Every structure is written in C-alpha cells, then in structure tokens.
C-alpha cells in the first residue's frame, strides 16, 4: 500500500513541486507514494468563491473561513478514510523526527495548508486536526511547510533511500545532532580529514563519531542536549531503585 499525501491548499499546482524530483520523484513514479491535492476554494459556497474574511475584533489580514475549511476536510476524510489530518501553523506543536517516523509508517496524511492570518479557530474544535509547526519561523503559506514535512516522511518509506539503515545515524534519530562528514581529497586548502577516519579502526571511528555528535549537540542545541542527558539518567535511576527494592 502506498503512502498517500493529500494537501488541502489554495495552490494545488505547488504539489508535488520539488517532490517530483530526485528520490521522492522516483518514489512517486514507482507508486511508493501518491499525491492528491485538494483545492480549498472548490468548497466555497458563494458565487465569488470566497475562502477568507476579516478577523473578528479587527486587525490586519484575512482569516480562512471555518465553513470552507470544513468542506475541504470532510471531503478529504471521506475520500481517504483513516488518514490523520494535520494543519501547518506556527501555533502548532513543533514536529519531531519521532513523529515523522510515525507518519511515514502510516497510510499517509491530509495536510491543511494555511494562508493569510491563518485559520478560524473553530475548525480545530470541530474537526480532529493535529496542529504542527516546522519551527519558530513564519512562512507566506503552509504549502512550503507541507512540502518539508512530506519530504521528511517520503525519504523514510521502504526502498526510497536504498539501504534500510541510511537514516539510522542522522540528526535527531538518537536524540543528538549528526556527527560531521568528510570525503576526498584527504587534504583541501590545508585542512586534512581527521586521522581516526582514515585508520580503518571501526571501534575508534564509532567512538569519535559519538563524541563529535555529543559535542555538536551540546554547543548548538542545548535543549536537545539536556533531553539527551535526562534520558540517559532515567534508566540508571530506575536500575538503582530496582536494586534498592
């Protein structure tokens, strides 16, 4: 069964976009995944096909209408039963690699792409929608965020990356940033590949990579480092309690 991506968007021509190239493109051609974008505007009910209105209480910008969004969501859920519904919004929960793996292991996702000032909040009360953020940044629309999320999922689908272990040592997979990589030439602009990587000693290489990953995480992502330290401490604490019992 292929992974089904269902973007709900005002700009369906943006899909598959860059996902029609490289690994994701080959996977699309082979049927590993498929893309079925839905035009939100098709569910407007007036002759002008209006999808947005001014914000209640005043303020800048326009807000996507709950009734129109509900029509698009209901259509997608009926056409693709069992798919989770996600909304791309900076107000959402930051996505994690663990959540990406969960999505990639499932049948696909319906992804609601925002525009303007965002969504009428009532849509989240009325429909089962997971609000997701790709980071502390603001984009002009949810389509680019949806493409990022889909790329993260598609590369994890069976056969897409070739070797099944290709994604195992990447950043975030073990709670750390990934270790640095090098390739030929051995010396470039006076900078030489670390000797340990040329030693052929796999145990030393593994230890060096672990140390480099930990150091990069500690310096660049103290939030991840703190969680990593906490995760290492919890099993040890549990073992001590078991011994005491």
UniProtKB/Swiss-Prot annotation:
Q: Name one GO cellular component term.
A: cytosol
Q: Could you tell me which CDD domains the record lists for this protein? A: TrmD-like
EC annotation? 2.1.1.228
Q: Which principal EC class is assigned to this enzyme?
A: transferase
Cellular localisation: Cytoplasm
**Keywords, ordered alphabetically:** Cytoplasm, Methyltransferase, S-adenosyl-L-methionine, Transferase, tRNA processing
S-adenosyl-L-methionine among the record's keywords? yes
Q: Name one GO biological process term.
A: tRNA N1-guanine methylation
Family annotation (InterPro entries): Alpha/beta_knot_MTases, tRNA_m1G_MeTrfase_C_sf, tRNA_m1G_MeTrfase_TrmD, tRNA_m1G_MTases_N, tRNA_MeTrfase_TRMD/TRM10
- Which SUPFAM superfamilies does the protein's record reference? alpha/beta knot
Respond yes or no to whether keyword Membrane is given for this record.
Answer: no
Q: Which reaction does it catalyse?
A: guanosine(37) in tRNA + S-adenosyl-L-methionine = N(1)-methylguanosine(37) in tRNA + S-adenosyl-L-homocysteine + H(+)
Signal peptide residues are none
Molecular function, one GO term: tRNA (guanine(37)-N1)-methyltransferase activity
Q: Which residues are noted in the entry as S-adenosyl-L-methionine-binding? A: 114
- What would be one Pfam family of this protein? tRNA_m1G_MT
Q: What does this protein do?
A: Specifically methylates guanosine-37 in various tRNAs.
**Subunit details:** Homodimer.
Family assignment from sequence similarity: Belongs to the RNA methyltransferase TrmD family.
Q: What is this protein called?
A: tRNA (guanine-N(1)-)-methyltransferase
The species is Sphingopyxis alaskensis (strain DSM 13593 / LMG 18877 / RB2256) (Sphingomonas alaskensis)
